Curated annotation (Swiss-Prot):
One term of GO molecular function: zinc ion binding
Active site (UniProt): D74, E133 (proton acceptor)
UniProt enzyme class: hydrolase
Binding site for Zn(2+) 1: H72, D103, E163
Family according to the record: Belongs to the peptidase M20A family. DapE subfamily.
Comment on bound cofactor: Binds 2 Zn(2+) or Co(2+) ions per subunit.
Keywords (A to Z) from UniProt: Amino-acid biosynthesis, Cobalt, Diaminopimelate biosynthesis, Hydrolase, Lysine biosynthesis, Metal-binding, Zinc
Subunit record text: Homodimer.
Known role: Catalyzes the hydrolysis of N-succinyl-L,L-diaminopimelic acid (SDAP), forming succinate and LL-2,6-diaminopimelate (DAP), an intermediate involved in the bacterial biosynthesis of lysine and meso-diaminopimelic acid, an essential component of bacterial cell walls.
Chain sites annotated for binding Zn(2+) 2: D103, E134, H348
Pfam families referenced in this protein's UniProt entry, alphabetically: M20_dimer, Peptidase_M20
Protein name per UniProt: Succinyl-diaminopimelate desuccinylase
Record NCBIfam families: dapE_proteo, PRK13009.1
Length: 381
């Protein structure tokens, strides 16, 4: 297999049915590829007894500067009805179809092919690949690998995360930060009764709706220099009541807040709890955070990445902080990170696909950036 052909590599990697958490063999496959390129590979398994997540740390060279590429092999379930087998990748009319094409197996392969074309590495190259970024066991993925790296004295100088950061065209956006994501579950208790005798009951739906309206009417902030305003979206309202003449005894709701660096998960929980308490005392509110707001301040390496994108695509990449959560929020507390990958338009969708030309172009961007990174690092030393 030609390691400098990103499309062929992507077809192989995408053929692994690596629905999160990835147990498909994709991680050992990547370890084999990188071993052939001279990387020292460590397959790292973390878990809690009920689940085990396989991860990969691979390194070429030693010391600094260390340029790391991060990514994930796990994918969301295919869902729906595909025109092609989601795990039998096909190239048709210049498009590569299959689950993981956009998010983010093709980007991993583009970076590997970029590395395969290097004449020399005047420093250290590394890969951090996890088998669970999409699912519920993320604590055993990138976070656990970073803990392992810290214990072993490994700290990259810069990281490129291959998430699908591009919007309409490859290279139009580079993500330097991510908003935090906080999920809430609200439950209000009432008094069950007959709809004809509301004075003998208390309808918890009224309390839930009042709380949600107050939350939606609350302006959390006006945004910052790098982040848009924080906002809340209601995702569920439920009573589990199939009886038309019954006032239910309880009602639940769920909502999500995407928040910027003016807040923490705990400060937002206190704010939401105060709103609930202003309406009723008969409630419970729980929360689960999928990462706080994070940002890597633009640096000479970020500028270099933008320069390379401009050279290859002709586009002036926008530095953004919107979009969904990613492992960048974990990596950014460890080392500076920028996300640059393929367009996100079909990520997680039926018939997920990317342009073959974009895969080849992304490989060229990665290749030039790797060379330029070491040149910039040497000029600063």
């Amino acid at each position: 297999m030609r390691l400098d052909d990103p499309v062929s590599l992507a077809c192989r990697l995408m053929s692994y049915p690596s629905v999160t958490p990835d147990r498909s063999g994709a991680i050992p496959f990547l370890a084999e590829l990188l071993s052939d390129l001279g990387f020292r590979c460590e397959i790292l398994s973390f878990g809690n007894g009920d689940v085990e997540v396989k991860n990969l740390y691979a390194q070429y060279g030693n010391g600094h500067p260390n340029l790391c590429f991060a990514g994930h092999t796990d994918v969301v379930p295919p869902g729906g009805t595909w025109r092609t087998d989601p795990f039998s990748p096909q190239v048709k009319d210049g498009m590569l179809y299959g689950r993981g094409a956009s998010d983010m197996k093709a980007a991993i392969c583009a970076y590997i092919s970029a590395v395969a074309r290097l004449d020399s590495v005047p420093g250290c190259l590394s890969f951090l690949i996890t088998g669970d970024e999409e699912g519920r066991w993320r604590e055993y993925g990138t976070k656990s690998v970073l803990d392992w790296m810290t214990k072993n004295g490994i700290c990259p100088d810069y990281c490129v995360l291959g998430e699908p950061s591009s919007r309409k065209r490859l290279g139009d956006c580079i993500s330097i930060g991510r908003r935090g994501s906080l999920n809430f579950e609200l439950s209000c208790r009432g008094v069950q009764g007959h709809v004809a005798y509301p004075e003998l009951a208390h309808n918890p739906i009224d309390d839930v709706l009042c709380i949600l309206r107050k939350i939606k009417d609350t302006t959390l902030d006006s945004g910052t220099d790098h982040f848009p305003p924080s906002h809340c979206e209601i995702t569920s309202i439920d009573v589990g009541n199939d009886v038309e003449n019954l006032i239910p005894s309880s009602a639940t709701a769920a909502f999500n807040i995407r928040f910027n660096d003016l807040h923490t998960a705990e400060s937002l929980y206190r704010d939401m709890d105060a709103i609930c308490a202003s309406v009723t005392s008969n409630y419970t509110l729980s929360h689960r955070c999928f990462g706080g707001a994070s940002i890597s301040q633009p640096s000479c390496y970020t500028a270099t990445l933008c320069e390379v994108v401009k050279e290859v695509t002709g586009l002036d990449a926008r530095l953004i902080t919107d979009g969904g959560t990613s492992d960048a929020c974990i990596i950014s507390s460890f080392c500076p990170v920028a996300e640059l990958g393929l367009p996100s338009g079909t990520a997680h969708k039926v018939d997920e696909c990317v342009s073959v030309a974009d895969v080849l172009t992304l490989a060229e961007i990665y290749h030039r950036f790797i060379n330029r990174f070491f040149a910039v690092a040497q000029s600063r030393s």
